[in-house]
């Protein structure tokens, strides 16, 4: 039987892949996951901005998460958009595919820095089912992409 302390040490993440690299976001910031649809390009936008989508009357910028993280990707494999919100900013992250929601305990989380490559964009590594998942800090990523010029 779980104690209250055990329950407090659990949290959920949405896991997904880019170029066979497993990554995850906190589910608290995820609004929905949709299939990649028609993305309207925006002239003179930043290199990681793929364009915008109209989602039920809301215009949402879509960014290529692989470009933000500096990892390889195959544009043909990018089939899903993770729509996320922090504070008043709503962004769609283009990824290969969503794997699902995982319930994680604190003892599965390695808070050591993943690498200099991800810096503050990563909260650490999640160890689950013999696989390592890079646990991303969605707040830091959205802050980084909106702080200078906006998406």
From Swiss-Prot:
Question: Which function does this protein serve?
Answer: Involved in the transmission of sensory signals from the chemoreceptors to the flagellar motors.
Pfam families with a match to the protein in the record:
CheW
Biological-process GO terms, alphabetical:
chemotaxis; signal transduction
- Its Gene Ontology molecular function terms? protein domain specific binding
- Report the InterPro entries cross-referenced here: CheW, CheW-like_dom_sf, CheW-lke_dom
The protein's gene is named cheW
> Start and end of every CheW-like domain?
10-147
Question: According to its record, what are the GO cellular component terms?
Answer: cytosol
Record protein name field: Chemotaxis protein CheW
> Keyword Cytoplasm: yes or no?
yes
Q: Which organism encodes this protein? A: Thermotoga maritima (strain ATCC 43589 / DSM 3109 / JCM 10099 / NBRC 100826 / MSB8)
Cellular localization per UniProt = Cytoplasm
Q: Keywords on this record?
A: Chemotaxis, Cytoplasm
């Amino acid at each position: 039987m779980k104690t209250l302390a055990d329950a407090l040490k659990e949290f959920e993440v949405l896991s997904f892949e880019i170029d066979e690299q497993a990554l995850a976001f906190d589910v608290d910031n995820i609004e929905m996951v949709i299939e990649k649809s028609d993305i309207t390009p925006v002239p003179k936008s930043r290199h990681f901005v793929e364009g915008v989508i109209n989602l039920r009357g809301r215009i949402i910028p879509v960014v290529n998460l692989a470009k933000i993280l500096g990892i390889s990707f195959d544009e043909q494999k990018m089939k899903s958009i993770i729509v996320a919100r922090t504070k008043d900013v709503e962004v769609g992250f283009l990824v290969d595919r969503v794997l699902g929601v995982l319930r994680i305990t604190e003892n599965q989380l390695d808070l050591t820095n993943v690498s200099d490559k991800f810096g503050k964009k990563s909260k650490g590594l999640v160890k689950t089912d013999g696989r390592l998942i890079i646990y991303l800090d969605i707040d830091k990523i959205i802050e980084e992409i909106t702080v200078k010029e906006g998406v």
